[in-house]
Amino acid sequence: METIPSINNNDVEDKVVNTRPLFCIFIGLILGGLFTYSFIVDNVVLQILLIIITTIVAICLVLSVFLKSKLKSYFLIFILLIIFVGVGSLLTCKSFKSFSNYPLQNTEYIIEGRIKQVAKNENTITIVLQNIIVNNKKYDYNIKFSTLQSNLENDYIVVGNALKAKMQIENVNLINNGKINSSLSMDNIKYTAKLKEMIEYKIGSKTIAEKFCNKVQNILLTNLSNEKSWLSYDILVGDRVNLQDDLYSLFKDCGLSHVLAVSGLHVGLIVVIIVFILKKLRLKQPYILLLMSFILILYCILCNFSPSVVRASIMAITYLVAECFGKRKDSLSVFSFAGIIILLIWPLHLFYIGFQLSFVAVFGIILLYKPIYNMFKHFNILSNIASSLSVTLSATIATFPIMASNFGELSIGTLFSNLIILPIFTLNYYILFISTLLGLIFNVSFIFLVVENIFNIIFSLGGVFSMLGSIEISNFNTITILMYLVVLFFATEYVNPKLKFKNIITLCMVFVLVVSVAICNTTKQYNQNYIFANSNIENCYVLTTKNNANYLIGVGSDGGEYEYNQIAKMLYYRNIFNVDAIIVLNYDVKFQDNIAMLSNKFKVKQIILNENVSQQDIRALSKYQKSNVFVHNFEKLLKLNEDICIRGYMLNNSYFAYNLCVNEKEFVILDKSLTQSRINYINENLKNKQLILYKDNLINSVNISYNVIKELNYSSDVKLKV
């Protein structure tokens, strides 16, 4: 959640459509982006809604010619809205086309690039390369790859150096499971790669920002334990690549994950610290404004222009400008101005969850803080406690549908954590920030001891509140999220409380919202075809029958929280809340946690594993959840129900393909990795089968002779007509 400067009591005196054109421009840019997105993912409902809005505004434009001047202002606002719907649509469309232009094919290249980012995790290392050179031609996008640390000379793998290697590249799909892969697009990562052969390293130089960040890293690593140093680095500059997974899970489970992303909370604290110091030095307001603006711009650069940091910085600078010139501080207009700047420069940020949570949280605080605070004061609750609770509740209520859409759960301990832990965290942030600045010049290790101990207290309290668990919450789609926010806005004082029938209209909107959410959470019905879909990770597919039975085949290739989240998102996107069976042909102990979590979350009835699974693993899985666990030799046919059978094809003790028999019609699904021995097996044994495979395999395996009926991109659906 976020804190913002105090809300002026005059913010809600007038109607929004009369006095806040910036808000209408911001809404127009959002609707324009969604309009473009809806056509790309074929969201017919959203298209219809936006067409209706466009039609209404067009009618208003015509009518405005014949209306009196008093009413004309309303229609001029609508005209402004439609203009920026068009602007937002054009900018988003341009960004989509720009990112979706892949100049390189998915094959092997000799690639040279500058190391931009390095993340080490036990035995593996993940590297992001920039300033890419392929065949003596420069490209302005980045490439990301992971490999074993033993494959590289770690002394040379530092930010600023360059490397040259043979790599197998694969383009990043902008849309996965109906959602934009905004985290990669924000970092301009167009390709992921697999390292084939390392060729050479080159010594390079760091930028000024990189040198500063490296200096901060060294100070933190010298004075704090490893996990706390990377946590501190994350909350100072927003770089989470080396943050330990269990530490992130702790903050997430207790409802404090928002403090790990540099946001309005952190920017606000920095502004408070520096402005306080500058005022003590008796600097005049214009000089404070200039110096603070310069510092915040530098901070945005250090944080790689994170949307939440840019938003908070723009709002802070705007408030300082208003204070400097004695102007009224209008929270909604300042908030909208920040959003306009970001969407004009980076249109795809609209689809980034960090942008959504940051702006919606602040929107909720602007709308709901005052009425909730007044309610707490009515019960004689202390001002500081009432203020903290009001901010937390306002942001939580507003972001509820976005949290539901992306995570499907809400931490029970959120309120307690934000009331008790957040003030302690805020105090520790002050100490950490000041000690890090002093550490650039002096040895202040004794101050870092305080930071270390306060972190220990935070971890202990977080562990207690995380034990409260979480509750599952309903799924929301884009339409229902928009409706939810409109209802919130309409119910507040920003819409004239004297408006006739306001309560009746609000109740009607709530009723429509409830019905829409219910429809959104209704399992899709497939009456004719069998639906086969793959997630945006390797070796994981879902099969939905015409009787709406769901079978999850495979749970990924690496295990870990990322794959679990991607699988859960895939199932939620398809409105699948119950899975009849999880089938894993190549079981490994690293899949154990994900299988257990998926089984609990999606009420899995059966888990079917390959025959070489140990009894110890079976007992472990049975202990974690209530599903029945079976083993099967997948070289023999397994009957799932009356219509569907499955069997696997094995080479070198590993299944690389499996056969689905649906109503006596056979389909063979191939794994993404096709070695030459597997290709030979296909040519000899499966050439008369109907195959479903990844499109990349078709491109790279021209020597396969088979009857290909479907080519899979990530997140594609296939209707098996039988």
In which residue ranges do the predicted regions lie?
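Residue-level signal for inorganic ion chemistry
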Residues: 32, 113, 167, 354, ...
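Alpha-helical transmembrane segments of polytopic membrane proteins
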Residues: 46-57, 357-358, 418-423, 477-482
